[in-house]
Structure formats: C-alpha cells, structure tokens
C-alpha cells in the first residue's frame, strides 16, 4: 500500500530482520538509518489473528503444530513465548515501544485499514508531507507468500464465534493493557 501509493521502497530482512519479529530495541535499531524510514506497524485483533496463526503458523518447525486442535495450539509454547497469545502481547508491546522511540512511524489496525484506506493514506501523506499522491486502494489479500486475489479479506479479519471455554483460554493470556493500546476489546 505504502509502496504503491507513495513510491516507497521496502527494506528487506537484512534491515532489522524478519517483519514478524519482536521489534528491536534502541541499541539495535540505532545502528541503522531509521531517520529516512517510515515504519508501519500493523496490528490485528488477537481473536482473528490466533485463528489465522493456527491455519498458517509462523513457527512450523514443529511438524505437527498444524494438526493441533485450536485449543491445544493456543496453549502450545512457541519459541521463547509461553504461548501464541503471550507472543501477540509481547510483539505488539514491542511495536508500540519502538514507535515511541523512532522518528517516523504509524500504527495501523488492519481491520480499520480494511474499512477506510483513505484515512491511512491521509495519515501517511501527512507524515511524508506528500499530499499530491492519489489513493490506490489495496483490494487483495497480501502475506509473505504474495498477493492472493481469491481470499476474502473482510471474512479473514472477522472475529470468530468461539465457545466460552476457548474465550477464557485466550483471555487468560491476553494483556488488557495491550488490548487497550491496540483499541481492541476483550470478548466476554
């Protein structure tokens, strides 16, 4: 979106690592030219995110992780994280921290972006002081494997209807503070 609308270059993994990583701390990112970068941090509702993560986990080194029922997957320890919800909390907290430390950043809830791309186009235009750029909407689903025209973005972002037990399991690891920072509400 930012590349198409504002002719921005994407920095690859040799610049501060993998896009899904925990945001680097100042002693790491300060070694790079962050002054000329716009960092775009994308947040996703943890209730729809965990379902997507279950379907296509970042951590697929454990061959049977995709075979776990959702309840077991949510409680499965991933790398240094107690579970995927703890990972969601820590990663999003790290994005807020880094956003506060660096000169140019924007935090976007993907659900809000999907509803009103014009608002985010205007926010980025303000940051870049480039109000002459027309809005080119992004209407296809994009992930690390590329663009997917057949995937319905709105339905993939919709919060699933979980049973009470699953909601309790998810909520037991969710940080209310992080949820508030992300403008999400706990399911009850």
Each predicted region: which residue ranges?
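Short, surface-exposed basic-aromatic patches at helix termini and helix-loop junctions that form
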Residues: 30-34, 122-129
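PAPS-dependent sulfotransferases, especially Golgi type II membrane carbohydrate sulfotransferases
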Residues: 99, 126-188
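A structural signal for well-ordered alpha-helical scaffolds and beta->alpha junctions
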Residues: 43-46, 88, 92, 117-121, ...
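Short catalytic/ligand-binding loop motif for oxyanion handling, primarily in non-cytosolic enzymes
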Residues: 47-52, 114-118, 142
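Short acidic alpha-helix initiation/capping motifs at coil-to-helix transition points
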Residues: 27-28, 114-119, 147-148
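PAPS-dependent sulfotransferase catalytic domain
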Residues: 1-126
């Amino acid at each position: 979106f930012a590349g198409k609308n504002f002719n921005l270059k994407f920095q690859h993994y040799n610049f501060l690592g993998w896009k899904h990583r925990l945001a680097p701390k100042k002693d790491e990112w300060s070694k790079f030219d962050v002054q000329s970068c716009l960092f775009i941090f994308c947040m996703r509702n943890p209730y729809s995110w965990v379902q997507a993560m279950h379907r296509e986990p970042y951590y697929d080194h454990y061959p049977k992780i995709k075979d776990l029922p959702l309840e077991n997957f949510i409680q499965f320890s991933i790398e240094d994280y107690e579970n995927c919800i703890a990972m969601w909390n820590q990663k999003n907290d790290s994005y807020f921290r880094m956003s506060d430390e660096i000169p140019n950043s924007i935090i976007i809830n993907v659900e809000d972006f999907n509803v009103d791309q014009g608002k985010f186009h205007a926010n980025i235009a303000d940051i870049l002081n480039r109000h002459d750029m027309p809005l080119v909407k992004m209407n296809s689903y994009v992930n690390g494997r590329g663009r997917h025209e057949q995937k319905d973005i709105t339905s993939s972002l919709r919060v699933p209807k979980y049973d009470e037990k699953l909601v309790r399991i998810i909520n037991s690891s969710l940080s209310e503070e992080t949820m508030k920072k992300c403008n999400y509400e706990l399911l009850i």
